[in-house]
Amino acid sequence: FRRVLFRSKTLIEQGDTERAIHALTNFIRNDAHVNDEPYYLLGNAYRKMGDWQQALNNYLEAIERNPESPAVSARDMIMNILNFYNKDMYNQ
């Protein structure tokens, strides 16, 4: 369990987000009782790729599994970014 998460975190940090997403998705698929951490890491990988919707979806799943998850602050950060850009779109 920890090895998969550590490896995925390292892949994300190295920019190999597609491999991290694949590993985490397989891990989640094979263990229905996972905690929030794989979803938080998936959110990070999607955020790094610029896929805001998938990032939010995974952060929300992490928060549902653990309301104290670090995904709470990650979700808030994305919402602030999206709100900022949406305001800019209205001012053009």
What are these regions (language model features)?
Residues 6, 40-41, 74:
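"A position-specific structural signal for the A-helix of alpha-solenoid helical repeats
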